[in-house]
């Protein structure tokens, strides 16, 4: 008999320092009104000494505490991130060491703002195999270290944070449908972290450490391609938008959510948002949003609600999941 997987616990963690739009206006030519009207963002949390693995480890500890599990009972840890502490060891390996999950294998998954959705899909397959019983899936980012703080077109958008879930094997299906996609042909529209150095054998070099984005292209991609895939997902599951209690989307821009809701014919209230507090936290945005929705009582994790989750971003990548929570 095929095993299934369910989200049994959620948690998130934000660094303490808050940088408001007014704070940014003191550093560059911008204003709170300019940022809010174009993005819906009012502030963001920024690390001052913590690393991505520190944020992810805080989430892992919270998940263990909530579930009353010992770290030795975790079979695997997947961390979705584009801002790792180092190329190696992986951020997930650092988390494994930090919490003492001696029996868990751990690795990072890189899919930018789609990372958490891709990681959830991967983890569900691991549990469905019947080999593993439970794992931690975490999205964590310190994007403040990848931002050019003199470029207002990107500096105002991003923040730091982490969120995650405990995924456990179960008997009833809760992952109802999924569509994961990549279009590398459009990858140049959103890039970061390019660091190609000269060697004794090659004089080619290219360094572009900061996030660079073609804003209009990304907006069109999200509102056209991702929205169409969400509709396709519902059709695949033989469901309509009325069957979905909430749509949890990557928190990139309030205008994107507004246009998606209109195109799908869904009440905007079904699209919870927290970007006003945190900005765009890439792979961390969806698990942070999910955790806050559970904390507020909007979502119950009792199997009675259907949510559509969608991540989209660099790659270009996008992924959609239909979940029974």
UniProtKB/Swiss-Prot annotation:
Residues 251-255 are annotated as: ACP-binding. It is an enzyme of class 2 (transferase). Its main location: cytoplasm. The keyword Transcription regulation does not apply. GO terms for cellular component: cytoplasm. Keywords: Acyltransferase, Cytoplasm, Fatty acid biosynthesis, Fatty acid metabolism, Lipid biosynthesis, Lipid metabolism, Multifunctional enzyme, Transferase. One of its GO terms (molecular function) is beta-ketoacyl-acyl-carrier-protein synthase III activity. The active site is at 113, 250, 280. Pathway: Lipid metabolism; fatty acid biosynthesis. It holds the Pfam family ACP_syn_III_C. Its EC number is 2.3.1.180. It catalyses: malonyl-[ACP] + acetyl-CoA + H(+) = 3-oxobutanoyl-[ACP] + CO2 + CoA. InterPro entries: ACP_syn_III_C, ACP_syn_III_N, FabH, Thiolase-like. It comes from the Bacteria. The keyword Lipoprotein does not apply. It is found in: Cytoplasm. One of its GO terms (biological process) is fatty acid biosynthetic process. PANTHER family: 3-OXOACYL-[ACYL-CARRIER-PROTEIN] SYNTHASE, BETA-KETOACYL-[ACYL-CARRIER-PROTEIN] SYNTHASE III, CHLOROPLASTIC. The last Arg residue of the ACP-binding site is essential for the weak association between ACP/AcpP and FabH. Belongs to the thiolase-like superfamily. FabH family. Homodimer. Catalyzes the condensation reaction of fatty acid synthesis by the addition to an acyl acceptor of two carbons from malonyl-ACP. Catalyzes the first condensation reaction which initiates fatty acid synthesis and may therefore play a role in governing the total rate of fatty acid production. Possesses both acetoacetyl-ACP synthase and acetyl transacylase activities. Its substrate specificity determines the biosynthesis of branched-chain and/or straight-chain of fatty acids. This is Beta-ketoacyl-[acyl-carrier-protein] synthase III.
């Amino acid at each position: 008999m095929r095993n299934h997987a369910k989200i049994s616990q959620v948690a998130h963690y934000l660094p303490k320092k808050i940088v408001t739009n007014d704070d940014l206006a003191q550093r560059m030519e911008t204003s709170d009104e300019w940022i809010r009207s174009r993005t819906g963002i009012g502030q963001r949390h920024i690390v001052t000494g913590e690393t991505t693995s520190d944020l992810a480890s805080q989430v892992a500890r919270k998940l263990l505490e909530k579930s009353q599990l010992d770290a030795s009972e975790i079979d695997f840890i997947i961390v979705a991130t584009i801002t790792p502490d180092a190329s190696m060891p992986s951020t997930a390996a650092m988390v494994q060491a930090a919490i003492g999950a001696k029996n868990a294998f751990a690795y990072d998954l890189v899919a930018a703002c789609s990372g958490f959705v891709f990681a959830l899909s991967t983890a569900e397959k691991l549990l469905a195999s019947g080999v593993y019983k439970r794992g931690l899936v975490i999205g964590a980012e310190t994007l403040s270290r990848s931002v050019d703080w003199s470029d207002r077109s990107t500096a105002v958008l991003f923040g730091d944070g982490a969120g995650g879930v405990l995924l456990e094997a179960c008997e009833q299906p809760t992952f109802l449908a999924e569509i994961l996609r990549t279009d590398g042909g459009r990858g140049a529209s959103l890039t970061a972290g390019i660091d190609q150095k000269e060697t004794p054998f090659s004089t080619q070099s290219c360094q572009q450490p900061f996030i660079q984005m073609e804003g209009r292209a990304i907006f069109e991609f999200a509102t056209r391609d991702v929205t169409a895939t969400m509709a396709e997902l519902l059709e695949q599951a033989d469901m309509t938008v009325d069957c979905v209690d909430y749509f949890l989307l990557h928190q990139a821009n309030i205008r994107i959510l507004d246009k998606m809701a209109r195109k799908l014919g869904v009440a905007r209230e079904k699209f919870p948002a927290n970007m006003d507090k945190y900005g765009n936290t890439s792979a961390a945005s969806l698990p942070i949003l999910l955790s806050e929705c559970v904390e507020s009582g909007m979502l119950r994790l009792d199997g009675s609600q259907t949510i559509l989750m969608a991540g989209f971003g660099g790659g270009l990548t996008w992924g959609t999941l239909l979940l029974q929570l």
